[in-house]
Amino acid sequence: MAADLAVLVAQGDATSEAIARAYQLARAIPEANMIRLPVPGGSDVIGEAAFAVLKAAIDARLPATAQATLVTWTQPSRVQGACSMGITSALAFGFSASQCGGCSRTAASAYFDSDSSRPFDDLGIRPSMMLGAPTLAAAQALIARGVAADGSQPAGTGHLLRTADAARSVRYPDWLTLPTAWATAPGLALRYTDASAASAASATTPTATANADTAISNQTDVLFYFTGLATVPLLASNRFLPGAAADHLTSFGGLLPGANGQMPATDWLAAGATASYGTVEEPCNHTEKFPKASVLIEHYLRGATLIEAYWKSVAWPGQGLFVGEPLARPWSQPPQAVIDGNALVVSSRSLRRNSIYRVDFRPYGGTAWAPLATMTAGQPRPVTWRVPLPADPAGGHLRWMGPCATQPALLCVLAQSN
């Protein structure tokens, strides 16, 4: 929600200020959430000490209600100390060598695959995303895609492409069952392509004449595109739908602007995607350091914003840079509960797959809750659940139980009547 997002503006940077103003107008960001302050510019890197000063200044001015931040500058994009963190992760966690360091295991994010909708309140974490647009015109186009996505419930295709680049295709086991698992999801078709037997040369040195062995082309309804290549060809031949998420597993996708000779994550935005992700230093191919498609897709279709879905999909995000329009929310549908005659009617699309939900009843003056009904959720989709109420002339209280925000395996109170 706009009230939960703080926009970080590089004071004196005309492009950052113009982009921030455009975003504020498009998303109705409260003025109190516009954080303008001097930011060291002219370099893609900010040192650990200078970043600590910057972060302290930001934290001191953030409203207590802010749950996430948007970065409107493009320099700096990473924080350099003993190792490098993406600035979006450094803003969320603070700079720490436990969050980066080449091929080593890095710190786990408590936000990964959680059900928290208020990460700062629940976990002390403010996820951050860099808009990633180099010009005002590019930013306006990206913002417009995000706004157009809201509530659109698009019909489109998600592409999961395993290439002959084995080192960069290590995420494919997560993709194998997704087309079947989502086969009945309204409007969504997931396609897994195994091109691992293609020429290794075509994967490592793709050209403009590449074919399905290395990339998709001439697709008109791309909602998701996840692959593993140093550089992804033929992006411009595809049409990305508003709200589309896309990324490629490679070492330096977040190392802006040049990605050390690889393709930067911002190329996805230039091609029409609404958000992407890349790492700012060599992470090696730990799958935990990159988005997990099964998690991202589920949270997104449950009604999460794009910043929530992307952040929840990365288990070890310290070396990562998240780029795009954070508030895009194609499948927004707030849960509703109403009394209809002698029944409670619950409507939602945000139920967690394979999780238990329960409605309890307690008579007025009573102390014990009694379960009225229990259900196990399936795929994220609109669900209407009608729960008969007890014929108690005195009436009573109702409560809605489901996965805890930070420990989804446990049941917590999600809502309760007065």
Regions found by a protein language model. Give the residues of each.
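Low-complexity, Ser/Thr/Pro-rich intrinsically disordered linker/stalk segments at domain junctions
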Residues: S332-N418
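Cysteine-dependent hydrolase recognition
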Residues: M1-V345, L351-I356, G366
